[in-house]
Amino acid sequence: MPRIVILIVTLALLPLRVACQDDLLEMLDKEIKPKRIPVDATFKSTRVINCHSVERMQGGDLELHVAHRFGLLNSGFKQFYGLDESSSHVSLEAGITDWLEIGAGRATVDQYFNGFVKLSPIRQSKGKWAMPVTVSLLGEAMTTTKDYPDPSWVVDSIHRRSFCWQVLVARKFAPWLSLQLSPTWIHRNMVATPQDANRMFALGVGGRLKFTPRTALTCEYFWLKDRELLTGAPRYNPLTIGFDIETGSHVFQIFLTNSFNILEPGYITETTRSWKKKELHVGFNISRVFTVIKKKNKK
């Protein structure tokens, strides 16, 4: 009789034992499966140098970005080798979420006010469902408040506006090497002559070569399609070579460039100085990140 009871109890508990084993195997399977791991810090700043990078502020973070360009180095002692002349741009840029950033700023050249939205729908990742690149989309609008030389000109506000659209595609090939392609479309509502195109296309390429945990060499070049057709002074493709220094929440960039302008319609379509002629400017960027809204720790 006791043997029969033991047999019945064993048979009754057998499905429960099998179910527990299945649950344990399922938990182990989830732990063993590779996870999708995002690749961070393709660039250390939201800019390569002039151009926006694929990076954006994390949700709740605010960046103060200051960009400055001096005059021509070869201007001589009379203009103190470019220090007497300068252009600058100051902006505030906020992370709405980890994939959406907005920003607004003011540039001294042509007295531009600008605002932009940057969206990062695709992020480079490793592991399960790995992605080879990070893709960010940028839309920017700007308007000039400058006075035109002829007081008789009546320039409506719509004609003072310019726009820029960019598809930023970057890959971090190694901890010390990152590259970015930046197809760019620029539209200017008002141009110098009817022969000048309102809309122009440019292709940018940029890179970052890391030397130490806090220093890197950066480079950026833009090829402007049909620049030879623009009237006025000859245009040159902007080339910029810089050196980055990271100090905690600050990133400091110092560089040489043939472009005096800072916003896209300026440095891409209006660069009239050449590296071959040694017409170079010293510039620097400073970014400072503040955490405005702290994220809640997930339990």
Give residue ranges: language-model regions.
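Cleavable N-terminal signal peptides
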Residues: 7-8, 18-19
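A contiguous binding-surface segment within folded domains or other stable secondary-structure elements
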Residues: 194-227
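Transmembrane beta-barrel domains of Gram-negative outer membranes and organellar outer membranes
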Residues: 21-154, 161-165, 170-181, 185-189, ...
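Positively charged n-region of N-terminal signal peptides that target proteins for export
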Residues: 1-5
